[in-house]
């Protein structure tokens, strides 16, 4: 085991991580050996639910298909290509990201968060596109990898584009 720090969204800011290896991991019929893992230590306190374990098939070299309607994930070394409604290039550097445009001209990388409920931008991106903080903020309860982000708020009237996907006058 070795130790490192990670910066994430939330009250804690920098958080300790232990880098380790799982000797064996079984997921249904799939058996994996020597799986690299992160141990979040110390655990977060005063959060509404216990932190969940996470798995990244991409970090193990697998492709994946997520079917939300069937509540099913399929992953493997070689999957048949399925035609999607939209296709765009992914970048994988620790997190999976796609390139997007904010308010017509500002390029930004967005983390692909399959469990996310909103599209979010950073405060730096909001400043770069000239959006001022509204006088009256709609506070959000955002939970990041380092706990609650008490400064998060909803910013209305932002236009977003991801390849052929467009959202105009959208709250982020």
Question: Residue spans of the language-model regions?
Answer:
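Pepsin/retropepsin-fold aspartyl endopeptidases
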Residues: 1-172
């Amino acid at each position: 085991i070795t130790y490192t720090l990670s910066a994430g969204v939330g009250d804690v800011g920098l958080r300790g991580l232990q880098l380790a290896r799982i000797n064996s991991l079984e997921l249904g019929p799939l058996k994996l050996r020597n799986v690299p893992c992160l141990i979040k230590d110390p655990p977060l306190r005063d959060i509404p639910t216990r932190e969940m374990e996470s798995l990244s098939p991409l970090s193990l070299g697998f492709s994946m298909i997520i079917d939300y309607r069937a509540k099913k994930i399929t992953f493997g070394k070689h999957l048949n290509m399925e035609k999607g409604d939209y296709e765009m290039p992914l970048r994988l550097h620790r997190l999976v990201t796609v390139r997007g445009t904010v308010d017509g001209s500002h390029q930004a990388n967005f983390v692909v968060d399959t469990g996310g409920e909103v599209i979010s931008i950073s405060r730096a991106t909001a400043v770069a596109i000239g959006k001022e903080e509204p006088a009256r903020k709609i506070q959000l309860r955002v939970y990041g990898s380092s706990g609650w982000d008490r400064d998060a708020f909803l910013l209305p009237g932002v236009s977003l584009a991801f390849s052929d996907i467009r959202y105009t006058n959208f709250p982020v």
